[in-house]
């Protein structure tokens, strides 16, 4: 097993980076784990998990007398771990450690692989594509995003595919099944091993709150959003087989409850349902009583999820009593991602082995105008990798009078908010901190003060900030941290928060009501087993109606940033959508590159889309010390100039 190809360790939403020339988390050859942080102003540093295989009991790191702190932990149990750092008793998010979206926040993660299991590794097999697709929700008018996996060969072939709609758990979002779940790598490996039917997989954000809606356990009317917005979008924009025989729905935890509810409400639309760590197993009774035949009903849990297992056993007996089949599975583990990866792997192998007769049973999406969006709303300001269409909520677990889940989602305070007068309001929850400050992109340091209104928070309003994009570095007791309740990007060779201040005379980068293109993530392995991800933008309708011109523009990022920064900091997709929508440009593909991208990789990418090596290529590079605001302006002029 080659650890270099372990996507779980080396690929994350916001990747890890070197901290004082050391990794924040290192999996040693003997299976132990070493934690490290450079915090020269700290007196004490600790780490702790969330329970389960990584205890919530804090582990103290030892100072190395050179500003760093480290600890080596033996016999660390395999799993993907959410965890926390504590600097002088203040819980922080480490900007040099890998970050994903979980627990309604940017949260540090790392992985210890299970010996003998490589089903979720990045193997040297043909890789599918993950596409980021925007749609407008008919429920609340928000512009939202789905992550869509298409199998290897999808772009160049004429085949059509069945679709699995796959939902995340509470506190997570549409990014979870890719970055934490590794579902794309699992599918690549299953398809390469001929263990499953090639399929399209759609992962969407399950939060469908309306304005001023009282938020309860099932967050809004996601059922309607899936049926009336997401499925029509997928069937209009992807090569899919239609009809219930070619659709399945599944999810984990909260998502399992949503999947069960959706399948029970619409048995005419889905032929299979997967329930991973089912938190609303009682809804299965509606599926049991349905007159429609479900080809696969899969229920799973970790062996430490005792209450859920009791519910599964009860439902299995009920299915059997009525002469219907169901498949229960139990895996070693708690309520955590390794259980759900194995659940997904096993469920995927069951799917679409039956009659694939098609039926056009979904109406096309009715055009919906998104709400007027500006930079004072979270949807616009926080269009970042881990905060797209953010919820800004936490969860209070509760049960109703029948003992069924009925949790609430109270609002939380935004870490960064741009006010109506274009000031930046910053807030950080750090009740035990001695000092909190922010360092702006221009180098100015602003001290925060303890809030008189919100216990445990530090706050400040900063007037007259620079218009446009601003990096904001939060400091706790002199140590740089990530504010988990604010947008997160990547700069200065680490994760970093940012603020967007409206520009008076420039809006090409804003998220607007227009036809949206797609971002595609293409994966490759080099000869040393290193994995690279390359991001490609194609405009709306690319490949149809002579939209594509065969022209390519390659964007090269700054030395201390990564290629994905073009999406969330450069807002390249928004700029291209808006320029295309106004007829300024047409049919140009964008390849977002690191400084190390090779001509071979560029050639492989363009070949996927049928573009010849001889096609005209333009190059645009962000300066190493250039602000994103300046880069956006220059890029717009550049694109209009080459058209």
Regions found by a protein language model. Name each.
Residues 2-16, 20-58, 62-435, 439-445, ...:
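Non-catalytic cap/lid and distal C-terminal segments of serine-dependent acyl enzymes
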């Amino acid at each position: 097993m080659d650890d270099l190809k372990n996507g779980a360790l080396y690929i994350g939403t916001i990747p890890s980076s070197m901290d004082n020339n050391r990794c924040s988390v290192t999996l040693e050859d003997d299976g132990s784990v070493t934690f490290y942080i450079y915090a020269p102003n700290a007196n004490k540093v600790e780490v702790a998990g969330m329970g389960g295989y990584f205890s919530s009991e804090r582990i103290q790191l030892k100072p190395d007398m050179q500003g760093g702190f480290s600890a080596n932990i033996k016999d660390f149990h395999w799993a993907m771990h959410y965890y926390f750092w504590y600097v002088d008793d203040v819980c922080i998010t480490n900007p040099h450690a890998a970050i994903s979206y979980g627990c309604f926040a940017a949260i540090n993660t790392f992985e210890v692989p299970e010996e003998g299991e490589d089903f979720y590794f990045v193997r040297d097999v043909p890789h599918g594509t993950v596409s980021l697709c925007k749609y407008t929700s008919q429920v609340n008018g928000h512009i939202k995003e789905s992550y869509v996996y298409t199998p290897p060969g999808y772009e160049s072939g004429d085949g059509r595919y069945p679709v699995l709609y796959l939902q995340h758990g509470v506190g997570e979002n549409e990014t979870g099944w890719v970055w934490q779940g590794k579902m794309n790598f699992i599918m690549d490996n299953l398809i390469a091993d001929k263990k499953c039917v090639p399929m399209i997989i759609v992962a969407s954000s399950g939060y469908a709150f309306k304005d001023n809606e009282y938020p309860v356990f099932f967050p809004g009317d996601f059922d309607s959003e899936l049926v009336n917005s997401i499925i029509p979008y997928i069937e209009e924009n992807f090569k899919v087989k239609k009809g219930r025989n070619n659709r399945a729905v599944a999810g984990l935890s909260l998502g399992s409850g949503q999947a069960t509810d959706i399948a029970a409400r619409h048995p005419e639309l889905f032929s299979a349902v997967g329930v991973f760590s089912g938190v609303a197993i009682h809804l299965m009774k509606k599926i049991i009583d349905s007159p429609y035949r479900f080809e696969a009903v899969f229920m799973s849990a970790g062996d430490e999820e005792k209450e859920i297992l009791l519910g599964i056993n009860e439902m299995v007996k009920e299915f059997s009593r009525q002469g219907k089949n169901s498949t229960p599975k139990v895996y070693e583990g708690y309520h955590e991602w390794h259980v759900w990866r194995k659940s997904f792997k096993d469920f995927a192998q069951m799917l679409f082995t039956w009659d694939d007769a098609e039926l056009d049973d979904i109406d096309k999406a009715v055009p919906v105008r998104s709400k007027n969006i500006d930079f004072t709303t979270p949807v616009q300001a926080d269009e970042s990798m881990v905060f797209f269409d953010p919820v800004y909520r936490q969860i209070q677990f509760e049960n109703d009078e029948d003992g069924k889940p009925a949790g609430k989602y109270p609002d939380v305070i935004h870490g960064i908010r741009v006010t109506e007068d274009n000031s930046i309001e910053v807030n950080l929850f750090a009740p035990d901190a001695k000092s909190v400050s922010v360092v702006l992109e221009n180098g100015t340091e602003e001290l925060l003060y303890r809030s008189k209104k919100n216990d445990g928070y530090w706050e400040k309003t900063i007037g007259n900030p620079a218009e446009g994009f601003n990096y904001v570095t939060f400091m706790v007791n002199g140590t740089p941290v990530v504010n988990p309740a604010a947008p997160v990007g990547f700069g200065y060779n680490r994760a970093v928060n940012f603020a967007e201040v409206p520009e008076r005379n420039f809006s090409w980068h804003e998220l607007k009501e227009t036809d949206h293109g797609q971002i595609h993530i293409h994966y490759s392995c080099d000869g040393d087993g290193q994995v690279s991800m390359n991001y490609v933008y194609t405009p709306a309708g690319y490949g149809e109606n002579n939209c594509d011109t065969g022209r390519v523009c390659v964007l090269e990022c700054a030395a201390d940033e990564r290629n994905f920064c073009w999406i969330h900091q450069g807002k390249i997709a928004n700029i291209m959508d808006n320029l295309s929508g106004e007829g300024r440009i047409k049919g140009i593909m964008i390849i977002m590159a690191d400084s190390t991208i090779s001509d071979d990789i560029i050639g492989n990418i363009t070949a996927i889309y049928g573009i010849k090596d001889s096609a005209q290529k333009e190059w645009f590079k962000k300066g190493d010390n250039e602000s994103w605001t300046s880069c956006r302006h220059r890029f717009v002029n550049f694109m209009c100039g080459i058209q």
